[in-house]
Amino acid sequence: MSDSKYFQTTKKGEIHELKEELLSQREDKKKEAVKKVIAAMTVGKDVSMLFTHVLNCMQTHNLELKKLVYLYVMNYAKNHPDRAILAVNTFQKDASDPNPLIRALAVRTMGCIRVDNITEHLCEPLRHALKDQDPYVRKTAAVCVAKLYDVNPELVENQGFLNILNDLLGDSNPMVVANAVASLTEIDEVSKKEVFRIHSGNLNKLLAALNECTEWGQVFILNSLCKYTPRDSQEAENVCERVAPRLQHANSAVVLSAVKVLMKYMNSIGNNDVIRLFCKKMAPPLVTLLSKEPEIQFLGLRNINLIVQKRPEILQYEMKVFFCKYNDPIYVKMEKLEIMIMLANEKNIEEVLLEFKEYATEIDVEFVRKAVRAIGRCAIKIDRASERCIQVLLDLIQTKVNYVVQEAIIVIKDIFRKYPNKYEGIIATLCANLESLDEPEAKASMIWIIGEYAERIDNAHELLNSFLEGFKDENSQVQLQLLTSIVKLFLKRPKDAQQMVQTVLNLSTQESDNPDLRDRGFVYWRLLSTDFEAAKAVVLSEKPLITDTTSHLDESLLNELILNISTLASVYHKPPETFVTKLKGLNKRGLRNKEEEDEEEPDYVDDDNMNNQQGGQQQQGGYQQQQQQQQQGGYQQQQPQQQQPKSGNLIDLDLSDLGGALPNNNNNNYGNNNNNNMYSPQPQQFNGNSNDLSFLGGGGGGGEVQAPVNKVVVFGGDRSQAIQISGAFTRFQGRINLELNLLNTSQQGMSKFKIQFYQNSFGISPADQILSCGAIEVGQSTDVTIPISCNGQISNPLNPVIDMAMMVLPSQERFYFKMNFPLLCLLTETGRLDRESYLSMWKSIPESNERSVEIQVRLPHVDVDSILRRLNSKNIFEIVRKKAPNQEISFLSCKTESSVYILIELAFNISTNTCRCSSKTTSPDIMALFEHNLNLLINNQI
């Protein structure tokens, strides 16, 4: 009879009977009883009261019974650590048993029991097991070290287990080597210092073990080889030759791991013929992945996507294997389309377009859209194929299938941008399908085409006017594009669009709740009212040509993902530390010993820049405007306030989003962030019946104005709740605020609100729990600013998430939600140090508190001045700067509300678009979060 019988009894008094059976002198009865206990435990019954009785069964030579008892102990030891200690003597005795299976079982079980009391007694048995004569015991003990490190890292380091593990890399048994590699790799990923380093001494040992260990052991060893950088081209070639046979393995994981090693080592090979040889060897196993189950196909395709971006020559002749089959799942088809676009070239474009055209007639709407868009991407990628792509798109438009037509128009808009004034002859065909457009992106694309080529479309004003009639009901994307296109039409044909432009500007600035639309409306308003020719120069300027977007990963990220082939990172196309909790903030290794250069005079000091940073300079109508007050040390003296520009000055408007820009005359001072957002100025009152635009006078900037706040929906996003809450934390004029927008989605009005913060890492709470806002009627919303109190103390573990509750009074109805608190809000306006104080403080902070991390600057070019202005706007102040060829080094300081200083050195490498950030602080626990925010600031993402 099978073991299923143990799951079928549920009678009263069962526990008592089990106790009796566990006390039996017969081993077969004990074994049956323990099986029943395990079965009850498996289905969720509490059998912890039998702990002592089961523990007594450990004293046996029956291996099956011992395994069952160990399983029970592992399950309940965490909840009963005081009882688990009773098993230590038996574990230690079993760890020295003559039977290697029992020795290994004892060590494995002790490693799985995550209780401090047990781990203290594990050290000696583990040390003996690591040096055991039997390889089975050694390989089990190697894995146990990683488990022990997860519970108590210091214990593992102090006991010297890491050194023993490194010695096991030279073990005669390949499985011991593989397990030692796996254990060291896992420890190295979460350790703050390097514990696993491959060098020429152990490289050959790993390669020798590669041929003899199991398939998963091969995966561990292959992955570890990616940590090694070959000394020269010959060594890289030798390693590739040893790894290449693994490409023929039946296990897909082994194949992908071998591909990963080859992809890395080929970068070090100087002989192009050898590289071509290895590329040729990699193609068949990658193609074989596409003949496996759909799930493995998908994983293979995601990895192939990265490989093709890095080395397209590997699969350049394998286009046909990526053609979609009728029975492929949709997720496989989508990935195949991406790779087909990457591999498309002038030689194969004809057959690729025939495939895409065929896909565009299928039933699945999303797949059809992707296929149509793929045709457009091929047109942008391959200049000589653009005309053929246009013809295919026109053929698809003739099918009159609604979603095909709309997607084709979206794609043709991009082709027009890539090839201006080349295919305008098809505009009439596009306009004939105007009435079938119902999707926002398709409408916006058609409106863009009409506005861009308004001078060639006789009835352009009529077409745009038809969209203007339903302006208020349109999507914001359509509204923004319609506004821009009508302004373009007015600049090209003023007589036809004069009334229209007045109407659209009025709708955008006076009757819209969309801040983006209002901002753009005010920009156009002032341009048109100030200088017609200047407006034409800006709005109708020559636009940059769009480029091929097939390779959407920047090179640094791609190189990192190549080293993570066959892992989850290669599927997500994200670095591991972005989604693996243990790795977040732990890639900050490589702490360098700071040279004595800090004691020397800097090579270059920008005195003008230092002076411009002094005092509180008046900010003018821009994003992130703040006055600098209460400066320290040599920065007490204030500069005179800069002269404000005249109202309506076109030169000061940031119009880069409109496709054109005029020279910027603003002084390049960090204290003066002229990133004007058109929120502070308000238009003058006008007579709506006026037929000219003289009423569009520009307003002048006033005092310090808070930037518009980008609120995020944090509760009730689907409007299924009684209220929708959007919000964001801000810092303005030295105060932390919580900006909320409350939307009443219930069936009755709301009059009074109360907010509560639960205990959090930053010690923040609302200054007044009762919100100062009026009643909110059904369907209405209101904005409210909540001053935040901060006790200044940051507690550990640091968690940026704040738990909150909103209460509606007097009904007492509560709504619970969470918000992320940005650490930058804690940085005060008094965080600037003078140079002497900076050097003195740097030396006083222990070297152990120094951190170093390399930040990839994902901007078109490294504009150090612009980056430092952004940092200054967030109260991260530059002290001094040093310049060298292709490098600029800036020293900065900032201070939190709790008076914790953070000292930073940013070394910008202009040639590699990187920034090395070294920092010191007396509170290192906050640095992982601070470095994350610094990365976003440098890359202009916040």
UniProtKB/Swiss-Prot annotation:
Its main location: Golgi. SUPFAM superfamilies: ARM repeat, Clathrin adaptor appendage domain, Subdomain of clathrin and coatomer appendage domain. Residues 596-609 have a biased composition (Acidic residues). Residues 613-645, 664-677 have a biased composition (Low complexity). Keywords: Cytoplasmic vesicle, Golgi apparatus, Membrane, Protein transport, Repeat, Transport. GO terms for cellular component: AP-1 adaptor complex; AP-2 adaptor complex; clathrin coat of coated pit. It comes from the Eukaryota. The keyword Protein transport applies. InterPro entries: AP_beta, AP_complex_bsu_1_2_4, ARM-like, ARM-type_fold, B-adaptin_app_sub_C, Clathrin/coatomer_adapt-like_N, Clathrin_a/b/g-adaptin_app_Ig, Clathrin_app_Ig-like_sf. SMART domains: Alpha_adaptinC2, B2-adapt-app_C. GO terms for biological process: aggregation involved in sorocarp development; contractile vacuole organization; hypotonic response; intracellular protein transport; mitotic cytokinesis; vesicle-mediated transport. Residues 590-700 are annotated as: Disordered. HEAT repeats lie at residues 45-82, 117-154, 156-193, 273-313, 384-421, 458-495. It is found in: Golgi apparatus, trans-Golgi network; Cytoplasmic vesicle, Clathrin-coated vesicle membrane. One of its GO terms (molecular function) is clathrin binding. Residues 678-693 have a biased composition (Polar residues). Belongs to the adaptor complexes large subunit family. Subunit of clathrin-associated adaptor protein complex 1 that plays a role in protein sorting in the trans-Golgi network (TGN) and endosomes. The AP complexes mediate the recruitment of clathrin to membranes and the recognition of sorting signals within the cytosolic tails of transmembrane cargo molecules. Also involved in early steps of phagocytosis and macropinocytosis. Adaptor protein complex 1 (AP-1) is a heterotetramer composed of two large adaptins (gamma-type subunit and beta-type subunit), a medium adaptin (mu-type subunit) and a small adaptin (sigma-type subunit). This is AP-1 complex subunit beta. It comes from Dictyostelium discoideum. The lineage of its organism: Eukaryota, Amoebozoa, Evosea, Eumycetozoa, Dictyostelia. The gene is ap1b1.
